[in-house]
């Protein structure tokens, strides 16, 4: 019994070390990362940290870093106007050619084809293994008809990064609070996005906030596109 308890405590320590490493890797995808750096940070030898990572995560450490960098690249390809060469070099690929080759292995097309598709296929996105302390949200899709919404729009630029978008959340909450104060009905936030014209590193987000009821002081109209939506992200309901 004592042995089992010690084993459990040791596993918890290892898991904590791995979570710290995963956080460090996520923060350094656009910086050089070597096995020596990871071994030094973890306190394990090169061989032991690779064995530990593979045993717990079921994927080799080097492969995990490579796929996370490729997924970071996919986000930059889709959401920014950065050149393929800049993306390749920022994520420490040897060349644009080697980047394109690895990208095609994971996503089945070249980075340029990926950028210009009229849809975003997320099937091969390799997510981070980070365990985040947050409440799980049940995802469900609803058929939402083409609907005219009356309200106002606001626009802002954000950096495409792994950091928490605190300023963006604060801005959207400000507009939501104002809508909830004025209207006792369902409130809709509908957003579109495109690469910013101000900087290749930025993304421009335009959000239309409003209701299906027309009010005198909300003159603008936005008609939603008919299709499948996740209501937890699109519709904000007055409590």
Swiss-Prot record:
DNA-binding residues (ranges): 36-57, 84-107
Single GO MF descriptor: sequence-specific DNA binding
GO cellular component: cytosol
PROSITE patterns, per the entry: HTH_ARAC_FAMILY_2
Pfam families reported in the protein's UniProt record: HTH_18
UniProt keywords, alphabetically: DNA-binding, Transcription, Transcription regulation
Keyword set includes DNA-binding: yes
Entry's Gene Ontology BP terms: regulation of DNA-templated transcription
Keyword flag rRNA-binding: no
Limits of the HTH araC/xylS-type domain: 19-117
InterPro entries in the cross-refs: Homeodomain-like_sf (IPR009057), HTH_AraC (IPR018060), MarA-like (IPR050959), Reg_factor_effector_dom_sf (IPR011256), Tscrpt_reg_AraC-type_HTH (IPR020449)
The protein's name in its UniProt record: Putative HTH-type transcriptional regulator YkgA
């Amino acid at each position: 019994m004592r042995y089992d308890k010690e084993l459990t405590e040791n596993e918890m320590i290892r898991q904590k070390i791995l979570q710290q490493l995963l956080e460090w890797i996520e923060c350094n995808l656009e910086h050089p990362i070597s096995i020596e750096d990871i071994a030094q940070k973890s306190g394990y030898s090169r061989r032991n940290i690779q064995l530990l990572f593979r045993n717990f995560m079921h994927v080799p450490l080097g492969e995990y870093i490579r796929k996370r960098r490729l997924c970071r690249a996919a986000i930059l390809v889709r959401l920014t106007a950065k050149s393929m060469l800049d993306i390749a070099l920022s994520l420490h690929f040897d060349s644009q050619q080697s980047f394109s080759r690895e990208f095609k292995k994971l996503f089945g097309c070249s980075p340029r084809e990926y950028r210009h598709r009229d849809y975003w296929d997320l099937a091969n996105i390799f997510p981070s293994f980070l365990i985040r302390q947050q409440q799980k949200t049940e995802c469900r899709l609803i058929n939402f008809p083409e609907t005219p919404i009356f309200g106002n729009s606001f626009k802002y630029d954000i950096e495409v990064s792994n950091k928490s978008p605190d300023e963006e959340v604060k801005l959207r909450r400000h507009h939501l609070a104002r809508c909830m104060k004025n209207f006792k009905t369902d409130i809709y936030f509908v957003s579109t996005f495109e690469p910013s014209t101000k900087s290749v590193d930025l993304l421009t987000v335009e959000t239309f906030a409003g209701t299906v009821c027309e009010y005198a002081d909300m003159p603008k109209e936005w008609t939603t596109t008919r299709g499948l939506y996740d209501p937890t992200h699109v519709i904000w309901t007055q409590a």
